[in-house]
Amino acid sequence: MAKILVVDDEKAIRNALRDILEHEKHTVEEAEDGAAGLEKAKKGGFDVVLCDIKMPKLDGLEFLQKLMAHNDEVPVIMISGHGTIDTAVDALKKGAFDFIEKPPNISRILVAVRNALDRGNLMQETKTLRQK
């Protein structure tokens, strides 16, 4: 299945997301803050990134901007317990694929990840067709 990076400073959230995603047969890697997450994400190989907004060292919106400057093809799903509509809109304007409020609902996470993977597959197919 997919390789997914979970970036969140709350271990309980990382563990919950890992359990949900691994149950769906995805491979999951974790990072405990935005800086560690950015380092892992820049190495590539991830199909989707799930990222918290409020984190130490590098917050989620800064993480998103830096990752988009490096690789704008990987879908990033932002997750926040402190999110407002303005925060969600800001994240989407900066390139986030989706925005989920904490505590995350299992169905909502799975739908967002599935949609992000579908988008990634469509982008890859489009790229392949353009090369022909």
For each predicted feature, which ranges?
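Active-site beta3 strand of CheY-like receiver
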Residues: G44-L50
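Receiver (REC) domain active-site loop signature in two-component systems and cognate sites
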Residues: M55
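Acidic catalytic/metal-coordinating carboxylates
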Residues: E32-A36, D59-E62
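Active-site residues of response regulator receiver
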Residues: D8, D52, S80
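Two-component/phosphorelay signaling modules centered on CheY-like receiver
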Residues: K11-E29, K43
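Flexible nucleotide-interacting loop at or near the entrance of a catalytic core
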Residues: R108-K132
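Short amphipathic alpha-helix used as the core "switch/output" element in two-component signaling
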Residues: E39, L61-E73, D90
